[in-house]
UniProtKB/Swiss-Prot annotation:
It catalyses: L-aspartate + NADP(+) + H2O = oxaloacetate + NH4(+) + NADPH + H(+); L-aspartate + NAD(+) + H2O = oxaloacetate + NH4(+) + NADH + H(+). The iminoaspartate product is unstable in aqueous solution and can decompose to oxaloacetate and ammonia. The keyword Zinc does not apply. Pathway: Cofactor biosynthesis; NAD(+) biosynthesis; iminoaspartate from L-aspartate (dehydrogenase route): step 1/1. This is L-aspartate dehydrogenase. It comes from Methanothermobacter thermautotrophicus (strain ATCC 29096 / DSM 1053 / JCM 10044 / NBRC 100330 / Delta H). The keyword NADP applies. NAD(+) binds at A124, N180.
Length: 257
């Protein structure tokens, strides 16, 4: 079997976990190229899998089949267009960037013109398959309540506090590195979902509670995520979702909507 050649943009917590799985033979892909603004971080990960750190994303594009963006919303705006123009598939982890309708439309058009695909993993929550299915009927409401330790939000406080209550489109602007979940929910059902963000010193995990109501009935999910040791803003589940997506691309049966 010819292995898919993969490059990574952004060598932080998610890239670390992906690289470890590939190194251990648990994901059948070739992880060949790494890009990060901090060259040393890229070199460290590349050394784990006999890969190559590059100084520019363009340097990997002639060789790869797919690129994993695991950097930032800015990387989605600045680098993903170049990847799609080269006809390469891309996995977008910084899904909050896709809440910008003009950017999203432009990227989808580039993908279409260049026979490429944009993959968005389910990230740090469960239930996106059910939400996508429910969106084929009439959805009445979708609400996300997120509780996080203050430290993971870069703040310090002794009491629980509601930091935000409103729509997902505004939440991703105020918390661009912390609320990709809200964006994933909105994109999955094509509506600006209701969001509440709570800083709670009593919790030590990132907790996401999703409630969906519609003509199908109702479902509710609660995900209590362990945070990555490398970056407490990132949930381990988010990395696992990207890893499973990469693995599924080489499989001949796909389970779930």
């Amino acid at each position: 079997m010819i292995l898919m050649m993969v490059g990574i943009v952004g060598c932080g917590a998610i890239a670390n976990l992906i690289t470890g799985f590939v190194r251990d033979g648990r994901v059948p892909v070739k992880l060949g190229f790494f890009y990060d603004r901090d060259l040393e971080r890229a070199e460290n990960l590349a050394s784990m899998v006999d890969g190559r750190a590059v100084l520019d994303v363009a340097d990997m594009l002639p060789e790869v089949d797919l690129v994993v963006e695991a950097a930032s919303p800015e990387a989605v705006r600045d680098l993903v267009p170049e990847i799609l123009e080269a006809g390469k598939d891309v996995v977008v982890m910084s899904v909050g960037a896709l809440m910008d309708p003009e950017l999203r439309e432009m990227l989808v058009e580039l993908a279409s013109l260049n026979d490429a695909t944009i993959h968005v993993p389910s990230g740090a929550i469960v239930g996106l398959d059910g939400l996508k299915a429910a969106s084929m009927g009439n959805i009445e409401s979708v609400k996300l309540i997120t509780r996080k330790p203050p430290r993971s939000l870069g703040i310090s406080m002794d009491e629980k506090k509601v930091l935000y209550r409103g729509r997902a489109s505004e939440a991703v602007k105020k918390f661009p590195l912390n609320i990709n979940v809200a964006a994933a929910l909105s994109l999955a059902c094509d509506r600006d979902v209701d969001v509440e963000i709570i800083a709670d010193p009593a919790v030590d995990r990132n907790v996401h509670e999703v409630t969906v109501r519609g003509d199908f009935g109702e479902f509710k999910t609660i995900t209590e995520n362990v945070r990555c040791s490398v970056n407490p803003k990132t949930s381990v589940m988010a990395a696992y979702s990207a890893i499973k997506l990469l693995k599924s691309l080489s499989e001949n049966i796909h389970i779930g909507t």
